[in-house]
Amino acid sequence: MSYGGGGYGGRNGGGYGGGRDGGYSNGHGSHGGGYGGGGGGGYGGGGGGYGGGGGGGFGGGGDRMSNLGAGLQKQDWDINALPKFEKHFYKEHPDVTNRSQAEVDKFRREHSMAVQGSDVPKPVETFDEAGFPRYVMDEVKAQGFPAPTAIQSQGWPMALSGRDVVGIAETGSGKTLTYCLPAIVHINAQPLLAPGDGPIVLILAPTRELAVQIQAEISKFGKSSRIRNTCVYGGVPKGPQIRDLSRGVEVCIATPGRLIDMLESGKTNLRRVTYLVLDEADRMLDMGFEPQIRKIIGQIRPDRQTLMWSATWPKEVRNMAADFLQDFIQVNIGSLDLSANHRITQIVEVVSESEKRDRMIRHMEKVMDGKDSKNKILIFVGTKRVADEITRFLRQDGWPALSIHGDKQQNERDWVLDQFKTGKSPIMVATDVASRGIDVRNITHVLNYDYPNNSEDYIHRIGRTGRAGAKGTAITFFTTENSKQARDLLGVLQEAKQEIDPRLAEMARYGGGGGGGRYGGYRGRGGRHHGGGGRGANDLPMGGNRRW
């Protein structure tokens, strides 16, 4: 969706689409309306949905094909022959200049901030100190933010200085604005796009959900500058994305596979890219995108400015930074060791597989106490089938639950996310694919129905709550089949000074047993109540005994 014209669903009007009475109906259900149903250009209907795009699963199932990019020509860059571009915009505010090194060190300590590299600029403590032009500041102040977050305080001066930057910070730390606002300044300093030009700013993201959220921020803050953008990702038709690219966009937010598809078919080029962002770099590598990322970066001039953002700093991410960034400066917020957000209360219960559903209902009754409850709970399960089974079970028991996973169509996923965000359906069941990149405010509880494959995924899952300074609660069911993960989990809990279930400590001490398997040994049995799974769990009418 390029900025300009039309309702929320694209250039061609259409707005939000569909009636609001029924559940998701995909345009053919019996609930009257549905979400974007009828094809008249609703949220995802018609051409020009929320960002368009086709092929690939949840974040690009098709994005993982290693032969993607085989048709791209290797570029032989002559730096001296390339047009010059401007990337140095930072002018230190007098208040920042006058701050002593001792004051700077104190500020960094208070915000758990560490920096590395040569000539790292001092952090800013207010929006005005960042020195953004008025057209940017007006948009920021209109949002009512009290002060920059820690990553913004240090990241803005770094990005505006034109340097290559690495930022390591937990999800929900405000990193999107850390690179989006300098991107807007960067664009406005470059020559206007000519016909046939590709984007000036390229942002690579691992999943379509994260890409759409980044697009929303760029649209919001780039509005006054009339900056055009598009989202390029798999799972939806290519037509709207191709139209946006052919009309010209200053910003392209993309998942790697679909972007390579567009490059190979000549629908865009990266010759004008001078500001490159790799968001959630660790997640992109986890998902196997490194070959595609390397092919894409090979199409971009080497004197570009590159910013890499990651929640963790493993060897693979360090290697990528060394390969693609030059003389970079780095900011870390919090510990580089694997650790959970300390604002999250972590409750781990050692249970048998057959106990899970009853335990879940018990927690739901506490969390969702009364219709006036403002709580939102995100439930993680190990497989798509179990996601549907649990959703059916909850709906039949009177709970307003919806599920999201890779087999859902894009417009259904958008609808589910909207219902969850607005609180109309405050319970969402998700597979791991939703654990990163979905930015839903005010999730108060995360419930790990199935324990994930490793402690990194555990930390990313529970990081959906306790964001932006809020507190949260994470409830986790842990079985003997997960015992190989017990020692790592115990370390995470101890680091965050959480209460330890004695049975978990015993498992960690003796280790062994069970385990293996993609999801810590979980076999997808779904406990003793088999809800039948299958398609259409989100369509199922809620049981007569409404629990919320």
Curated annotation (Swiss-Prot):
Keywords: ATP-binding, Cytoplasm, Helicase, Hydrolase, Nonsense-mediated mRNA decay, Nucleotide-binding, Nucleus, Ribosome biogenesis, RNA-binding, rRNA processing. The keyword Disulfide bond does not apply. Residues 156-331 form the Helicase ATP-binding domain. Its EC number is 3.6.4.13. It catalyses: ATP + H2O = ADP + phosphate + H(+). CDD domains: DEADc_DDX5_DDX17 (cd17966), SF2_C_DEAD (cd18787). A motif (DEAD box) lies at residues 279-282. One of its GO terms (molecular function) is RNA binding. Residues 515-548 are annotated as: Disordered. Residues 343-508 form the Helicase C-terminal domain. GO terms for cellular component: cytoplasm; nucleus. Belongs to the DEAD box helicase family. DDX5/DBP2 subfamily. Associates with polysomes. This is ATP-dependent RNA helicase DBP2. It comes from Pyricularia oryzae (strain 70-15 / ATCC MYA-4617 / FGSC 8958) (Rice blast fungus).
